UniProtKB/Swiss-Prot annotation:
It is found in: Cell inner membrane. NCBIfam families: PRK15432.1. The chain crosses the membrane at residues 13-33, 38-58, 69-89, 90-110, 114-134, 155-175, 212-232, 251-271, 283-303. The complex is composed of two ATP-binding proteins (LsrA), two transmembrane proteins (LsrC and LsrD) and a solute-binding protein (LsrB). The keyword Cell membrane applies. InterPro entries: ABC_transp_permease. Part of the ABC transporter complex LsrABCD involved in autoinducer 2 (AI-2) import. Probably responsible for the translocation of the substrate across the membrane. The gene is lsrC. It comes from Klebsiella pneumoniae subsp. pneumoniae (strain ATCC 700721 / MGH 78578). One of its GO terms (molecular function) is transmembrane transporter activity. GO terms for cellular component: plasma membrane. Residues 323-344 are annotated as: Disordered. This is Autoinducer 2 import system permease protein LsrC. Belongs to the binding-protein-dependent transport system permease family. AraH/RbsC subfamily.
C-alpha cells in the first residue's frame, strides 16, 4: 500500500492491466498487440494534453483553455496546408500559434496576477471565438495525404506521430527528474516563497509552463488533423477536462509540486482505454463520460482512504516507539529516590 501511494504510476499501470484483463476475459480475440496499438493511437491527443497540463499543474496552476487551443492550432495547420504551404511550414505555424496562446495565458496569470482558472476560462472562449471567426464557422477539409501519412502505422504498428509522443514523454521525463530546469517546476509548485529564496526564477518557470503547454496543445491539434483528415468547428471541445482528469488519475497533485509525466501519460491511456472498451462492446457513446467520471471518482475516493490509512499507520508507528516495553523505545533513567531524614 505504501509503495502504491508513493508511486502513483503503479496504480495507473495496474488499472490499465486490470481493464485489459477484463477485456480479454470477455473476448479473448482482443488479446493481440494490435489492440494496444489501437488504444495508443486513440490516446495520443489526450496524452499530449496531459503532458502539457502536468507542467502547469506542477507549478500550482491550471489551464482549462487547451481544448480551444487544440482546435485553433488544428485550424492553423489545415488553413496553411490548403493555402499551398509545405508541411513543415504549416506545422511550424501551428506550433507558433500554440506557443503564443500559451504565453498569453501565462501573461494573464503571471503578469497581471489573474487567477489561472479565471484567466483560462476567459481564453477558452476567446480562442474558440477566434477559431470560428477565422473559418467563418466552416470545417477545414481536403487536407493533403502528406499530413495524413504521419498518423499511419509504421514501425511495430506505431505511427510517426506516436513515436513523437513517446519521444516527448521520455525527453520531458528526463528533464523534469534529472535537470535543475525540471526541478524548478517542482520547487515553484511545492513552496513558492522557498523557491524564490533559493533563487529560482519563479515567473520565468510559470511562463514556460504555460507556453510549453500551449505548444503541446498545438501538437495535439496537429495529431487530430492528421488522424481525422479534416477539422470540424468544435474540435477540442471538452478535452481540457479530460486532460486534467488524466493528470489526477496519474498522481499529479492539484496543489502543485507532485507528480510525473509518466503518471499523466498512463492516466490518459487509461481514460482512452475505457472509451475503446465501450466502443469494442458497442455500448452507446453517452456512457463514455459517465463511466470515466465514475472511475475517476472511485480512484480519488480510494486514494483518499488509502492516504488516511497510511497516515494513521505512520502515526501509530511514530508514537509506538515511546510506549513502555517497546524494544525501539528510549528508556529514560529514573531519578534516585531521596531518603527522608527521621526527625528525633
Amino acid at each position: 500500500m505504501k509503495t502504491l501511494l508513493k508511486n502513483r504510476e503503479l496504480s495507473a499501470f495496474f488499472a490499465i492491466v486490470a481493464l485489459f484483463v477484463v477485456l480479454v476475459a470477455l473476448n479473448p480475440a482482443y488479446f493481440i498487440l494490435q489492440t494496444l496499438a489501437m488504444i495508443f493511437a486513440s490516446s495520443q491527443i489526450l496524452c499530449l494534453l496531459a503532458l502539457g497540463a502536468t507542467l502547469v499543474m506542477l507549478t500550482r496552476n491550471i489551464d482549462v483553455s487547451v481544448g480551444s487551443t487544440v482546435g485553433l492550432c488544428a485550424i492553423a495547420v489545415g488553413v496553411a496546408l490548403n493555402y499551398g504551404y509545405g508541411l513543415a511550414t504549416a506545422i511550424a505555424f501551428a506550433l507558433a500559434i500554440g506557443a503564443l496562446a500559451g504565453a498569453f495565458n501565462g501573461l494573464l496569470v503571471v503578469g497581471l496576477r489573474i487567477p489561472a482558472i479565471v484567466a483560462t476560462l476567459g481564453t477558452l472562449g476567446l480562442y474558440r471565438g477566434v477559431m470560428l471567426l477565422w473559418t467563418g464557422g466552416k470545417w477545414i477539409e481536403g487536407l493533403p495525404d502528406s499530413l495524413k501519412s504521419l498518423s499511419e502505422p509504421a514501425f511495430i504498428g506505431v505511427s510517426p506521430l506516436g513515436w513523437l509522443v513517446l519521444a516527448l514523454l521520455l525527453a520531458g521525463g528526463w528533464l523534469l527528474s534529472r535537470t535543475a530546469f525540471g526541478r524548478d517546476f517542482y520547487a515553484v509548485g511545492d513552496n513558492l516563497a522557498a523557491a524564490r529564496q533559493l533563487g529560482v526564477a519563479v515567473n520565468r518557470t510559470r511562463m514556460l509552463a504555460f507556453t510549453l503547454n500551449g505548444m503541446l496543445a498545438a501538437c495535439a491539434g496537429i495529431v487530430f488533423a492528421a488522424q481525422i483528415g479534416f477539422v470540424p468547428n468544435q474540435t477540442g471541445s471538452g478535452l481540457e477536462m479530460k486532460a486534467i482528469a488524466a493528470c489526477v488519475l496519474g498522481g499529479i497533485s492539484l496543489l502543485g509540486g507532485t507528480g510525473t509525466l509518466l503518471g499523466a501519460f498512463l492516466g490518459a491511456f487509461f481514460l482512452t482505454q475505457i472509451d475503446t472498451v465501450l466502443v469494442l462492446f458497442r455500448l452507446p457513446a453517452w456512457w463514455n463520460d459517465f463511466i470515466a467520471g465514475l472511475v475517476l471518482l472511485g480512484v480519488l475516493v480510494l486514494d483518499g482512504r488509502l492516504r488516511q490509512a497510511l497516515a494513521r499507520h505512520q502515526r501509530a508507528l511514530k508514537y509506538s516507539r515511546f510506549q513502555p516495553g517497546n524494544k525501539g523505545s528510549k528508556q529514560v533513567a529514573r531519578f534516585p529516590e531521596r531518603k527522608s531524614k527521621e526527625v528525633a
